[in-house]
């Protein structure tokens, strides 16, 4: 059993039972999940977007967030200055680079459905699942 850095795209796909959610379960398996401490805020924001677009109801959104809260994910404070450097070099957002920072510093693989983040990670020598 090892640790995996998981991003919001994978967590949300799993929570909403979207295409590929079975893939998430098979990749995660018995591994321990790690993410930057901003993950709950990202999940909350993504849920609110779904509510605003009338894709889910407020009640469903709250239920999804409660489901998220039950997932055992170790939240870690990212090195924000280093993440800003990565963002500048990669022409990316700091939020995405928090995941890259943690994966790089902890020498862990990254699990993301975000193609741009995956390309940036691979360019930086981070293994992606």
What residue spans do the PLM features occupy?
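Acidic, PIN/NYN-like endoribonuclease modules and their adjacent C-terminal/linker elements
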Residues: 1-3, 36, 100-129
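Active-site-proximal, substrate-binding regions of enzyme catalytic domains
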Residues: 44-72, 76-80
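Short, well-structured N-terminal submotif of metal-dependent ribonuclease cores
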Residues: 1-38, 50-62
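Structured helix-beta-strand junction loops
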Residues: 30-31, 71, 106, 124
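Active-site neighborhoods of divalent-metal-dependent phosphate/nucleic-acid chemistry enzymes
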Residues: 70-116
């Amino acid at each position: 059993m090892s640790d995996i850095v998981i991003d919001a795209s994978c967590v949300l796909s799993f929570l909403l039972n979207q295409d590929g959610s079975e893939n998430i379960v098979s990749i995660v398996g018995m591994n321990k999940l790690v993410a930057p401490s901003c993950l709950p805020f990202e999940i909350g924001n993504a849920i609110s977007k779904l509510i605003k677009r009338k894709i889910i109801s407020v009640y469903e959104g709250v239920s999804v967030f409660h489901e998220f809260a039950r997932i055992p994910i170790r939240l870690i404070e990212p090195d924000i200055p280093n993440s800003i450097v990565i963002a500048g070099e990669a022409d990316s957002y700091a939020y995405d680079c928090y995941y890259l920072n943690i994966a790089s510093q902890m020498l862990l693989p990254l699990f993301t459905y975000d193609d741009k983040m995956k390309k940036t990670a691979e360019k930086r020598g981070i293994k992606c699942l």
